[in-house]
Amino acid sequence: NSSRTSSAASDLHGEDMIVTPFAQVLASLRTVRSNVAALAHGAGSATRQALLGTPPQSSQQAAPAEESGLQLAQETLEELDWCLEQLETLQTRRSVGEMASNKFKRMLNRELTHLSETSRSGNQVSEYISQTFLDQQAEVELPAPPTEDHPWPMAQITGLRKSCHTSLPTAAIPRFGVQTDQEEQLAKELEDTNKWGLDVFKVAELSGNRPLTAVIFRVLQERDLLKTFQIPADTLLRYLLTLEGHYHSNVAYHNSIHAADVVQSAHVLLGTPALEAVFTDLEVLAAIFACAIHDVDHPGVSNQFLINTNSELALMYNDSSVLENHHLAVGFKLLQGENCDIFQNLSTKQKLSLRRMVIDMVLATDMSKHMSLLADLKTMVETKKVTSLGVLLLDNYSDRIQVLQSLVHCADLSNPAKPLPLYRQWTERIMAEFFQQGDRERESGLDISPMCDKHTASVEKSQVGFIDYIAHPLWETWADLVHPDAQELLDTLEDNREWYQSRVPCSPPHAIGPDRFKFELTLEETEEEEEEDERH
């Protein structure tokens, strides 16, 4: 069936390429219906006229066999129409999404196995992607709890430290919420707030290292959300400065610059034409707030590191999305500070709705959930295609939050789709953070996590692998959802991939054409694998 089988030479962006199981079922049923109609069409003039909606001129002239065939054809078509109607209106998020997720994981595992066999560095990239994005952890031998000079007390896990900001303006609110003697330069930089590729590093430099405060202050004003939700400017400013103070400036990547970048990226994605007027003001506010708090109080190590070292956080959150749960707890806890409740004028219903959405969005930033999120998004995109809805119709919470979760996840993984100078800075920062974790693991006698060993990691190869297996499939699917709005981002991503590929030591000649990206969501599983899955 053409809906289920794809040629290796097929175009990566082919319109008719359908790979998620649920969308394949719909396409297959449509083909069956079309075939039945065509077969019945040839049964005779009476059948043909009936199928076309016009009665035969003389039903008495029809032979009994033809009458029987006509009745069977009509009943079959009615059954198929009913099935299609049911399937098209089915909420596909859960079990159907799981089907696609499991399929994608099997496909990616095959690709990663091949990659790991190519070289030692290839094996490390493969292990990193598998452990980080596939929710698969190797068996580890847990050490005794390490002795630390300053172990985290339970009190700190639940939230507030003493106020970290040195001063709060009591009179006039600064134009961008931050005290700076470079306000004009900052204003010029923030003119790009609505554009993809804002130099958030420059914003950090010009705002006294308060990029998160400056960016959110600007974004909320740009969207007129302070007025919509009656958020007092002084309350917003106090909360933002407190929130930003709970990001660790000594953490190379997961600091307030990253948070500001994710907020601004999400702001741009929310403004894409395909999503115009799709989301309510409350949903937009929830998305911006989720991005703002999504990495607050990040210690610069991974969830698995916290689990392996028996940390208090892992204990509190039962090893499940440890950091993401902590970011949420801190972000909401800070609202309880003096004059920090930016949601004070929302109704109880609005507060509960916003909280639910923020929790769902931040928990979805756990990278181990990536494949499930991608599978859900891909299924949604393909289902919309095969049901010919044409426009993005999100008429239930499950669909709406799914797109918002994907949007925040895309913003969180937007570095490779940014202009190369920005992408390179982010790469340097994430590798510095990884290597710092690796050093801690080495000192503690732990196995060093993939990509965290500064002596063996290949930075360039890791970025090519990250784009091929994670970023490109995600951004390609997002681009399908908002087509054609994100084509420029996809082009940038592919150009950046080529730049890093050209710098891989002893790299082979560039692959061209459809094989350029090693992992494509168009791979077909063999019958043997399908049978093996059924046995398990």
UniProtKB/Swiss-Prot annotation:
One of its GO terms (cellular component) is cilium. One of its GO terms (biological process) is cAMP catabolic process. The keyword Transcription does not apply. Binds 2 divalent metal cations per subunit. Site 1 may preferentially bind zinc ions. Binds 2 divalent metal cations per subunit. Site 2 has a preference for magnesium and/or manganese ions. Residues 49-69 are annotated as: Disordered. It comes from the Eukaryota. Zn(2+) 2 binds at D295. Residues 178-507 form the PDEase domain. InterPro entries: HD/PDEase_dom, PDE4_UCR, PDEase, PDEase_catalytic_dom, PDEase_catalytic_dom_sf, PDEase_CS. Mn(2+) binds at D295. Keywords: cAMP, Cell projection, Cilium, Hydrolase, Magnesium, Manganese, Metal-binding, Phosphoprotein, Zinc. CDD domains: HDc. The active site is at H254. Mg(2+) binds at D295. It is found in: Cell projection, Cilium. The modification Phosphoserine is found at S507. It catalyses: 3',5'-cyclic AMP + H2O = AMP + H(+). 3',5'-cyclic AMP binds at H254, Q463, F466. It holds the Pfam family PDE4_UCR. Its main location: other. One of its GO terms (molecular function) is 3',5'-cyclic-AMP phosphodiesterase activity. Belongs to the cyclic nucleotide phosphodiesterase family. PDE4 subfamily. Part of a complex containing AKAP5, ADCY5, ADCY6 and PKD2. This is 3',5'-cyclic-AMP phosphodiesterase 4C. It comes from Rattus norvegicus. The lineage of its organism: Eukaryota, Metazoa, Chordata, Craniata, Vertebrata. The gene is Pde4c.
